[in-house]
Amino acid sequence: MQEGKISQIIGPVVDVDFPEGRLPSILDALTVTRADGTKLVLETQQHLGEERVRTVAMESTDGLVRGMNVTHTGKPIQVPVGLEVLGRMLNVVGDPIDGRGPVNTKKSYSIHRLAPRFDEISTKAEMFETGIKVIDLLEPYSRGGKTGLFGGAGVGKTVLIMELINNIAKQQSGFSVFAGVGERTREGNDLWHEMMESGVIDKTALVFGQMNEPPGARQRVALTGLSIAEYFRDEEGRDVLLFIDNIFRFTQAGSEVSALLGRMPSAVGYQPTLATEMGELQDRIVSTKKGSVTSVQAIYVPADDLTDPAPATAFAHLDATTVLSRSIAELGIYPAVDPLDSTSRILDPNIVGDDHYDTAQAVKQLLQRYKDLQDIIAILGMDELSDEDKLVVSRARKVQRFLSQPFFVAEAFTGLAGKYVKLEETIKGFKEIIAGRHDNLPESAFYLVGTIEEAVEKAKTL
């Protein structure tokens, strides 16, 4: 165990002096024991000459002073992995933060691991059902694939992620890993209590590095969650779900660290290594022949600008994109998914079947035609449309409302019981609306219901 001494502290960046020729390797973990006996973990980022390293702290550097002893652990940050972490809440370095005693696992993994080799990766395309109509029909998620939830502030990314955790954990009884990256601590607290109440917690491991943490923790916490998920995939042979909320904060923390380390900023002030950092994280989220990791990542879009380098870099890695739109949220349609902007690589008749594909395309064509007619309606009004176009508008508005549905996790806000809709029910409902079988029902009958039968029943009460 090599000992060094702190020579400089600038916020979350700490410089440490070591004897010449004994410098720790880049990414190695160092530990400092504070006066109150607590340990602080530092991660080596740069070598400054022969005797000094620059490190980034994983927790607040309050209480550190120059001259304090630093111990070199000889390896990168290690986190506990195994079945014992299920039902627990950890921080970036794998310490429990739920007040329920230590996590005793037989194994620990480094947070920095190589991506699986090409010959180990599985490329099988298969849809997995979420029970959310708009997603299953128009941008189906693939098992072992990566999905991004794009949206600006307050359009419902976190609620949608929480609904997915709820549906998948209950319906498919798989293991989930949730990484809270730089988001609100209150939301993490709500999620924890909701999971405890619903009984889902026993199949979930939670890792948090929230908004109040220094940038080092926010930059690394996604890797901690990923290492836990990799253990379940590689050693337990499981199909794991990895939820990351929010991947933008990973990039944002990387940008802060980059500036603190004195690197020249790149476009829009982001770090020059943006694409590399994102690639190193995303390349590890893959399915192998042993098991799969299906990931759902919330991606905050700064100022609703999808061309910003942070969301644009993430786009390249995804199999499906769910774009949440403020204009749809303003109509009161939740989940506020934009059906024309969202995409999926597996919406292909060879994978999902002709029936599903044809229904999805018909829905998109109907909504696109309605969008094209909206300018005419705004200027001339509905009366100037042909009878055929009036019918298109009427059906499109019903489809638009039928794409909404009540969520289990939002029962407290809506006062409506949550609904899980099976894929065949979803396809059947939209086919009937497009075929004109429900032209006589009012639009409001289709709003916030599950199946088409519920819409018919609701119409009787209106």
Curated annotation (Swiss-Prot):
<keyword id="KW-0375">Hydrogen ion transport</keyword>
<dbReference type="GO" id="GO:0005886">
    <property type="term" value="C:plasma membrane"/>
</dbReference>
<comment type="subunit">
    <text>F-type ATPases have 2 components, CF(1) - the catalytic core - and CF(0) - the membrane proton channel. CF(1) has five subunits: alpha(3), beta(3), gamma(1), delta(1), epsilon(1). CF(0) has four main subunits: a(1), b(1), b'(1) and c(9-12).</text>
</comment>
<dbReference type="InterPro" id="IPR050053">
    <property type="entry name" value="ATPase_alpha/beta_chains"/>
</dbReference>
<feature type="binding site">
    <location>
        <begin position="151"/>
        <end position="158"/>
    </location>
    <ligand>
        <name>ATP</name>
    </ligand>
</feature>
<dbReference type="InterPro" id="IPR003593">
    <property type="entry name" value="AAA+_ATPase"/>
</dbReference>
<keyword id="KW-0997">Cell inner membrane</keyword>
<dbReference type="Pfam" id="PF02874">
    <property type="entry name" value="ATP-synt_ab_N"/>
</dbReference>
<dbReference type="GO" id="GO:0045259">
    <property type="term" value="C:proton-transporting ATP synthase complex"/>
</dbReference>
<keyword id="KW-0139">CF(1)</keyword>
<keyword id="KW-0406">Ion transport</keyword>
<comment type="function">
    <text>Produces ATP from ADP in the presence of a proton gradient across the membrane. The catalytic sites are hosted primarily by the beta subunits.</text>
</comment>
<dbReference type="Pfam" id="PF00006">
    <property type="entry name" value="ATP-synt_ab"/>
</dbReference>
<keyword id="KW-0067">ATP-binding</keyword>
<comment type="similarity">
    <text>Belongs to the ATPase alpha/beta chains family.</text>
</comment>
<keyword id="KW-1278">Translocase</keyword>
<dbReference type="InterPro" id="IPR055190">
    <property type="entry name" value="ATP-synt_VA_C"/>
</dbReference>
<dbReference type="InterPro" id="IPR027417">
    <property type="entry name" value="P-loop_NTPase"/>
</dbReference>
<dbReference type="InterPro" id="IPR036121">
    <property type="entry name" value="ATPase_F1/V1/A1_a/bsu_N_sf"/>
</dbReference>
<keyword id="KW-0547">Nucleotide-binding</keyword>
<dbReference type="InterPro" id="IPR004100">
    <property type="entry name" value="ATPase_F1/V1/A1_a/bsu_N"/>
</dbReference>
<keyword id="KW-1003">Cell membrane</keyword>
<protein>
    <recommendedName>
        <fullName>ATP synthase subunit beta</fullName>
        <ecNumber>7.1.2.2</ecNumber>
    </recommendedName>
</protein>
<dbReference type="GO" id="GO:0016887">
    <property type="term" value="F:ATP hydrolysis activity"/>
</dbReference>
<dbReference type="InterPro" id="IPR024034">
    <property type="entry name" value="ATPase_F1/V1_b/a_C"/>
</dbReference>
<dbReference type="GO" id="GO:0046933">
    <property type="term" value="F:proton-transporting ATP synthase activity, rotational mechanism"/>
</dbReference>
<keyword id="KW-0066">ATP synthesis</keyword>
<dbReference type="InterPro" id="IPR020003">
    <property type="entry name" value="ATPase_a/bsu_AS"/>
</dbReference>
<keyword id="KW-0813">Transport</keyword>
<keyword id="KW-0472">Membrane</keyword>
<dbReference type="GO" id="GO:0005524">
    <property type="term" value="F:ATP binding"/>
</dbReference>
<dbReference type="Pfam" id="PF22919">
    <property type="entry name" value="ATP-synt_VA_C"/>
</dbReference>
<dbReference type="InterPro" id="IPR005722">
    <property type="entry name" value="ATP_synth_F1_bsu"/>
</dbReference>
<dbReference type="InterPro" id="IPR000194">
    <property type="entry name" value="ATPase_F1/V1/A1_a/bsu_nucl-bd"/>
</dbReference>
